Amino acid sequence: MLDGKKLGALIKDKRKEKHLKQTEMAKALGMSRTYLSDIENGRYLPSTKTLSRIAILINLDLNVLKMTEIQVVEEGGYDRAAGTCRRQAL
């Protein structure tokens, strides 16, 4: 199971290493600052696509996620740390 708090902390740490403010990173990713904050605080889990975009921006090796026992959620899987399931378009 994906640990949203660990993932969020990792993203936040890497963002700070790059000296990026939340507003700057969110704008570069095309998302709101509040959504990025929710990801960093473990309230929301990013989709695989969003996580890939974040990883590229902050030079995060996705293999690090495996080493820290964080599993990537596939599209259509769980989107919130609370376990709410996203609906897939048919």
Swiss-Prot record:
Q: Which CDD domains match?
A: HTH_XRE
Lineage top rank: taxon: Viruses
Task: Spell out the Pfam families in the cross-references.
Answer: HTH_3
Which InterPro entries would you find in this protein's record? Cro/C1-type_HTH, Lambda_DNA-bd_dom_sf
Where in the numbering of this chain does the HTH cro/C1-type domain appear? Answer: 11-65
Keywords of the record, alphabetical order, are: DNA-binding
Coiled-coil annotated spans: none
Q: Identify the DNA-binding region of this protein by residue numbers.
A: 22-41
Q: What GO annotations for molecular function exist for this entry?
A: DNA binding
Q: Which named protein is this?
A: ImmF control region 10 kDa protein
In its UniProt entry, the species of origin is given as Bacillus phage phi105
- Taxonomic lineage from the root: Viruses, Duplodnaviria, Heunggongvirae, Uroviricota, Caudoviricetes
